[in-house]
């Protein structure tokens, strides 16, 4: 770079059209030069006349020549007149205010600006301080851009050479195609940049160099966190969970959707410096930057994925060098001088725009950079550069910078009404960039200023404001967000792709779900803008939409999926491929229909692309975790060869992953039904045990790990379980959510671990707190009850009362699924809890809400549990069940038919009896003792209620603890509960069969006739339901779907319930018995004959009139 005086001389010679005499700097003394300048000024004004453009050029020529007189020789290069200028001490000359402003804007290096500020700092006014601050930030940003671009190209070349030497020509060809070269966003995406012309462009122009643009505005890109910041671990399923940390690589841009703007007046230079400052601190422009990442952080990422130690060291050194321009002594000295001048002038004397300019420049130059350097060093060391990315201002500014910024904010608050929309947006973004929590007065003043100038807010200001709101987090007023959303809704059609990404990413970071109308308008603009989006912007949009959990229309879903798979995905870098698939996977968690849009051709192309990248070794450890998780969420099941290549690429990088990433990898492998090798299991268990405290701090990651271990049938060693119990004590105290609590208890139950009393007490206490605060979801409540049954825990009356209240409160909500009813009631019985009849009635009435969603499996689980709890359903409930379930009996199995028939008959008997005591907590043991102590000679009414064999069979057996449901995972649909209920029915033999059976087969074959009229007098289901049941059972008999044991059990229960089988059922039963006689021994044949004989006798016996209670109960 030429020194200042040489450059000024060149400008003087370039304006020869209006200047006759050339300036000879090597021979003219400063005093003579001043007089000559005055003479030239007069002659130039006379010649140029009233031409404003030529007048400005000539005046600028004189100003630059005068600056040469007072300038100190620069160290950036040798001056032709340096010997003569250094021989005499030059006295700084005071320039006028317009001259100082134009000189500040005309400097092209930090050294020139520093020299000028040092000379003219005493003569600067408030406007000069703002101009100098913004221009300093612009020059530093350009220097960082050039260093980052050069670094990126060097590292890409070294990495390509290393891959070529290690993997051969074919592998190196793929590495060059995916890891180096400019403009790798593919044909389907282009970078939006500033055009050099004054006319507006079509919105999709190619990128150009910032040096060629001069003072033109540059486009700010999405921060590095879009590509690298999300690798901190697995993302929580379900919502909510953890959005990528929004680190603003730039607070200024000129991507206003209408193309570029060219500076045509000198008064716009301030806005130019403001909008162009720091645009390239984290990302070079698309024409130079590599698609794998931008800036020093992406370069360190690329170096970390390479196995060559020399590249790792080079990346670390280059990353430190790329961050050096902002921390150079010249920048620090100039910044200190400008701030001192601003405070000496008095902050009260500065206007609102001037304060905004000073504050914005300070934010760009003094934003926290330590965190970026730590990430780069971690990536260079191979410890996972992408782990643990923090939010804005995570490291924080220094105490001195924070004090200065707070004073500037305090002075700016009352003057925000003077600022333009552009100043307001940049000020808010600067606050977020520095990580300063604004006070209530500043938020109120900013909100009032936005409302005052809401008509002047353009797309650029609206997008920047939303992005800044997301970076600020909780320090945002809801009214302010709603105002910006209302303003942006009408202007979304003017948003550029970058601004669309900024807006939705800010809302996602703020966790603010916009209205459906705003989402509809956003989607209508997003679909045509996808073609102009870069890969980084597309990833940001996908992640934000998935985090917001907004409902997208079918056209937008299809456009996002098809565009990503067929457009930019083949041209993306490996890291962007993994991130795009991971983002689409998160979006599919919100929209369950998204995986159905992937056809075989699309899935084949994706698997082939990722297979080639796996063979080339282009993925880092965190990217591998993202890749597999994204494919799993998209319901893509890779072949065995792909999984083997994935595990081979992951094996060398296991030691680089943290506990969260290991949990995510293991959970994805479990979802793909791929059991890892024992060596990999040991590495995962050892790493998670060493970081158990960190793992349990993230409840989502710990739940994913526990679920993966259970799904893969991996039983951890006792040391690992001991560490889990020890570190989970504090989590049980104050951090565990409902699902995490249930998952933790269920995992211990599945591994057969019985925790100590203190751990169990904390489990009960934490669950009691969650139920008391109404934070226990139905899914977690049911799973927790099952885990408590398996762990052998006994709840106290207070916990039981809260549990019943939480269950009946949640039963009226849509989250309470049909399978929750049966599992909940069976678990209550197994825990020894007897709910009151009022509670049971309210639970049964709540089933009307989801009655149509009950299947045969759900009914087969619920009805036996109601019998065990001695529930008395309302007559209307029984009628409705018979009317709706009669048509579904044809889909039942033999065991389900038996379960429904026995349970429904006993529920009719319980309803007719109406003699069960309504005690809040009646243990099954006490109920059994009360039934045993009842007098033998009871009345007929009591005999029809408590003493009948069919009524006392299942509850008496359950009183001994016969039904203990096995542990069921949170995602189970109730199959385990059905099996448990069927086991209980099979274990409890019919009372009539048990009372008449003896050790000899002859005694079994002769039932007592006096029991038949008593059985026929019992309440029974309606005739229509019985006819449907007999038809379904006969159909199964004709198809030989009854096992011998099921046939014996069915015949015994039918005789005990007093049901009269039709002749066709008896004929089919006889044919099945004849078939089974060939494979059954003598004892089994005698048992089958003894079970069928009472049914044959009952079929030929004359029917007796049912009692009044039975008739009223039936229909």
Curated annotation (Swiss-Prot):
Region (Disordered): 69-90, 163-210
Ranges of compositional bias, category Low complexity: 69-87, 163-175, 187-210
Keywords assigned by UniProt, alphabetized: Chloroplast, Plastid, Repeat, Transit peptide
Compartment list: Plastid, Chloroplast stroma
Record region (9 X 38 AA approximate repeats): 483-1068
InterPro entries: FAST_kinase
Residue ranges with Gly residues bias: 176-186
Sequence repeats: 483-521, 607-645, 685-723, 724-763, 764-803, 804-842, 843-880, 990-1029, 1030-1068
Any one annotated GO CC term: chloroplast stroma
Quaternary structure and partners: Part of a 400 kDa complex which is not stably associated with RNA.
Record's function text: Required for expression of the chloroplast encoded psbC mRNA, most likely for translation initiation. Interacts with the 5'-UTR of psbC.
Protein name listed in UniProt: Tbc2 translation factor, chloroplastic
Organism: Chlamydomonas reinhardtii (Chlamydomonas smithii)
């Amino acid at each position: 770079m030429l020194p200042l005086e040489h450059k000024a001389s060149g400008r003087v010679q370039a304006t020869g059209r209006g200047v006759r005499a050339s300036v000879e700097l090597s021979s003219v003394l400063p005093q003579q030069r001043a007089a000559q300048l005055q003479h030239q000024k007069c002659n130039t004004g006379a010649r140029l006349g009233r031409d404003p453009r030529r007048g400005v050029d000539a005046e600028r020529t004189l100003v630059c020549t005068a600056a040469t007189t007072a300038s100190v020789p620069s160290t950036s290069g040798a001056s032709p007149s340096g010997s003569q200028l250094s021989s005499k001490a030059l006295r700084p000359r005071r320039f006028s205010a317009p001259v100082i402003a134009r000189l500040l804007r005309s400097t092209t290096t930090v050294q020139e600006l520093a020299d000028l500020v040092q000379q003219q700092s005493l003569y600067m006014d408030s406007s000069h301080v703002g101009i100098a601050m913004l221009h300093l930030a612009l020059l530093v940003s350009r220097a960082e851009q050039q260093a980052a671009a050069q670094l990126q190209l060097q590292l890409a070349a070294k990495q390509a050479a290393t891959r070529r030497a290690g993997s051969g020509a074919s592998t190196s060809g793929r590495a060059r195609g995916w890891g180096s070269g400019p403009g790798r966003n593919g044909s389907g995406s282009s970078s939006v940049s500033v055009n050099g012309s004054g006319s507006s462009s079509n919105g999709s122009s190619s990128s150009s160099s910032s040096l060629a643009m001069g003072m033109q505005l540059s486009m700010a890109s999405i921060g590095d966190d879009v590509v690298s910041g999300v690798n901190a671990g697995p993302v929580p399923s379900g919502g909510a969970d953890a959005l990528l940390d929004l680190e603003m690589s730039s607070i200024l841009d000129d991507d206003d959707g209408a193309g570029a703007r060219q500076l045509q007046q000198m008064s716009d230079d301030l806005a130019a410096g403001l909008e162009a400052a720091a645009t390239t601190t984290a990302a070079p422009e698309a024409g130079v930057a590599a698609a794998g990442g931008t800036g020093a952080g992406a370069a360190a990422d690329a170096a970390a994925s390479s196995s060559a130690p020399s590249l790792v060291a080079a990346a670390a050194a280059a990353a430190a060098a790329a961050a050096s321009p902002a921390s150079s002594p010249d920048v620090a000295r100039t910044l200190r001088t400008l701030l001192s001048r601003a405070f000496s002038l008095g902050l009260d004397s500065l206007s609102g725009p001037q304060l905004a300019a000073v504050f914005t420049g300070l934010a760009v130059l003094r934003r926290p950079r330590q965190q970026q350097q730590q990430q780069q060093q971690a990536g260079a060391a191979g410890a996972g550069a992408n782990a643990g990315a923090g939010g804005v201002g995570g490291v924080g500014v220094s105490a001195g910078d924070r004090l200065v910024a707070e004073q500037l904010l305090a002075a700016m608050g009352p003057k925000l009404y003077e600022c333009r929309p552009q100043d307001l947006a940049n000020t808010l973004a600067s606050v977020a960039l520095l990580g300063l929590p604004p006070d209530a007065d500043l938020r109120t003043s900013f909100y009032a200023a936005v409302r005052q100038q809401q008509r002047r807010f353009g797309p650029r200001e609206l997008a920047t404001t939303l992005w800044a709101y997301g970076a600020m987090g909780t320090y945002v007023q809801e009214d302010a967000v709603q105002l910006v959303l209302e303003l942006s809704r009408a202007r979304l059609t003017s948003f550029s792709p970058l601004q669309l990404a900024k807006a939705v990413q800010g809302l996602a970071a703020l966790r603010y779900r916009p209205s459906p109308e705003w989402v509809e308008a956003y989607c209508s603009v997003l679909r045509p803008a996808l073609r102009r989006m870069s890969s980084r912007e597309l990833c940001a949009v996908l992640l934000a939409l998935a985090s917001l959990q907004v409902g997208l229309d079918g056209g937008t879903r299809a456009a996002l999926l098809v565009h990503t798979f067929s457009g930019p995905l083949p041209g993306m870098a490996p890291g962007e491929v993994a991130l795009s698939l991971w983002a689409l996977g998160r979006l599919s968690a919100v929209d369950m229909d998204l995986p159905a849009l992937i056809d075989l051709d699309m899935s084949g192309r994706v698997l082939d692309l990722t297979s080639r990248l796996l063979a080339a070794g282009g993925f880092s450890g965190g990217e591998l975790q993202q890749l597999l998780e994204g494919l799993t969420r998209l319901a893509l099941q890779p072949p065995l060869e792909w999984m083997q290549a994935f595990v081979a690429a992951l094996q060398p990088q296991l030691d680089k992953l943290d506990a969260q990433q290991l949990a995510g990898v293991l959970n994805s492998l479990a979802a793909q039904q791929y059991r890892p090798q024992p060596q990999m299991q040991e590495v995962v268990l050892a790493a998670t045990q060493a970081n158990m405290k960190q793992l349990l701090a993230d409840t989502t990651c710990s739940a994913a790990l526990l679920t993966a271990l259970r799904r893969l049938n991996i039983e951890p060693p006792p040391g690992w379980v001991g560490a889990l119990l020890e570190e989970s004590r504090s989590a049980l105290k104050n951090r565990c959510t409902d699902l995490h609590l249930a998952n933790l208890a269920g995992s211990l139950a599945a591994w057969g671990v019985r925790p100590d009393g203190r751990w169990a007490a904390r489990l009960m206490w934490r669950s009691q707190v969650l139920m008391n605060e109404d934070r226990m979801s139905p899914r977690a409540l049911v799973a927790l009850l099952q885990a408590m049954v398996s762990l052998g825990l006994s709840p106290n009356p207070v916990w039981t009362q809260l549990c019943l209240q939480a269950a009946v409160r949640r039963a009226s909500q849509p989250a309470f699924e049909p399978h929750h009813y049966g599992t909940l009631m069976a678990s209550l019985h197994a825990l020894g809890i007897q709910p009151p009849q009022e509670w049971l009635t309210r639970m049964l009435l709540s089933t009307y809400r989801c009655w149509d969603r009950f299947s045969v499996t759900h009914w087969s689980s619920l009805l036996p549990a109601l019998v065990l709890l001695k529930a008395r359903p309302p007559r209307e409930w029984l009628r409705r069940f018979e009317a709706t379930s009669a048509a579904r009996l044809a889909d039942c199995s033999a065991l389900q038919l038996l379960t429904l028939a026995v349970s429904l008959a006993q529920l009719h008997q319980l309803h007719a009896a109406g003699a069960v005591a309504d005690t809040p907590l009646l243990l099954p043991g006490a109920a059994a003792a009360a039934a045993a102590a009842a007098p033998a000679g009871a009345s007929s009414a009591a005999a029809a209620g408590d003493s009948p064999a069919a009524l006392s069979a299942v509850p008496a057996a359950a009183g001994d603890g016969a039904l203990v449901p096995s542990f069921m995972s949170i995602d189970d649909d109730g199959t385990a509960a059905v099996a448990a209920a069927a086991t209980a029915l099979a274990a409890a033999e019919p009372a009539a069969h048990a009372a008449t059976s003896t050790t000899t087969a002859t005694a079994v074959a002769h039932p007592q006739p006096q029991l038949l009229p008593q059985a026929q007098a019992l309440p029974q289901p309606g005739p229509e339901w019985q006819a449907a049941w007999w038809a379904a059972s006969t159909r199964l008999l004709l198809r030989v779907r009854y096992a011998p044991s099921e046939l014996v059990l069915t015949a015994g229960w039918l005789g005990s319930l007093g049901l009269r089988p039709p002749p066709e059922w008896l004929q089919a039963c006889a044919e099945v018995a004849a078939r089974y006689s060939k494979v059954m021994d003598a004892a089994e044949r005698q048992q089958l004959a003894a079970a069928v004989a009472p049914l044959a006798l009952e079929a030929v016996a004359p029917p007796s009139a049912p009692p009044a209670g039975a008739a009223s109960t039936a229909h």
